[in-house]
A protein has these predicted regions:
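Short, surface-exposed "cap/lid" segments of acyl-processing enzymes
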Residues: 1-33
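Glycine-rich His-Gly loop
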Residues: 1-4, 80, 168
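Aromatic pocket-lining residues of Rossmann-like dinucleotide-binding sites
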Residues: 22, 89-90
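Glycine-rich "HGGG/HGxG" loop immediately N-terminal to the catalytic nucleophile
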Residues: 33-47
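Alpha/beta-hydrolase active-site loop
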Residues: 46-67
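Alpha/beta-hydrolase fold nucleophile elbow
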Residues: 68-80
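Glycine-rich nucleophile elbow surrounding the catalytic serine of serine-hydrolase chemistry
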Residues: 78-88
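The alpha/beta-hydrolase serine catalytic core
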Residues: 91, 95-185
């Protein structure tokens, strides 16, 4: 699962490279664009964390339906906000996921949005305008309203299997404290 504002290939094609390396080792992978991002239909402005969790659950069901997939070996990988989404999908579907890989997970996107901050940008006018401008993209009011209702750590805590956390201590987008908190739960 990709980060906030990115597509299935991610910055510098990091997910495309990961998919190639997995394939070389005989491991199938699925990359996709969430609704409203990349080549997918929909508007970015309509995206919420909950809608991305729903997309993630649908992708998990799709992967489970593939004849060549060993259902006991399905793992989920997420980067940045995609790590937050991946952790929530894994928490909601613990029985269907054998492992979780999180690269610099960023549930702080959700928690900071409760204070009308988005990736370090003050979006306190989101209710007045109905959207926030973030690096030229419109983030809809629904994203803020959805964030008010979510507790990603509580959902992720329901996942009981292996988790691989990778996080740099100089990450300026996602605080290392996010991974430290995931480690605690």
């Amino acid at each position: 699962f990709r980060g906030f504002c990115d597509g299935r290939n991610e910055i510098n094609f990091v997910h495309a490279g990961l998919s190639r390396r997995l394939c070389e080792r005989g491991i199938a992978s699925v990359r996709f664009d969430f609704a409203g991002s990349g080549d997918s239909d929909g508007r970015f402005e309509d995206m919420t964390v909950s809608s991305e969790v729903e997309d993630g659950l649908a992708i998990l069901d799709y992967v489970k339906s593939l004849d060549f997939v060993d259902q006991s070996r399905i793992a989920i990988h997420g980067l940045s906000m995609g790590g937050c989404v991946a952790s929530m999908v894994a928490g909601l579907r613990d029985a269907d996921v054998c492992a979780l890989s999180l690269w610099c997970p960023a549930p702080d996107v959700v928690y900071n949005m409760k204070h009308k901050m988005l990736c370090g940008v003050d979006v306190s006018d989101i209710e007045e305008k109905g959207y926030a401008d973030y690096e030229g993209l419109r983030v809809g009011l629904g994203f803020y309203q959805d964030a008010l209702e979510l507790d990603p750590y509580a959902v992720a805590a329901k996942f009981t299997k292996r988790v691989n956390l990778v996080h740099g201590d100089e990450d300026v987008t996602a605080s290392i404290h996010c991974s430290e908190r995931y480690k605690e739960i």
